[in-house]
């Protein structure tokens, strides 16, 4: 099934690409695929390269660029809140093109104890013969099969893709670590959480 960005975010943008089918979102200009929308988050460590990364994505076939600040490019839409909206966009896109039963989410946050608590929750749910994924410092996946994780909380696009994949693989629940950094950056935006656990001050 094809879908346009307008169907995901129904506002008026005076640009042809807005109503054209697209092939998903991407944050890394080196991994862009033809027809995807490139999300250009501002790089504070390499601000001079922001425009070049976005231009590289367009050169590689990106349908458009959504940026936090204006980069002066063709097919660019400036959305200062993109960092906090992209998780919801990704969730809606994946559900539109490949519907699944959403996972029932349990998020654990706090200074200490996130890894232990999320793992215990996942083990407990799994013991009741219900598929449970776990995401955090010790790895991501459906117990007992975990793969190493580069971050406690994945970026919003990766997180939604992982949740979608786990649902397709038969999981019913997910217990995930919600780092303060991840929460501040909106990485969990788009997650439908049923329970939030706060371990300590």
Task: Tell where the protein language model's regions lie, with residue ranges.
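N-terminal leader/targeting and accessory segments in enzymes
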Residues: 1-92
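Phosphate-binding loop of NTP-binding sites
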Residues: 87-201
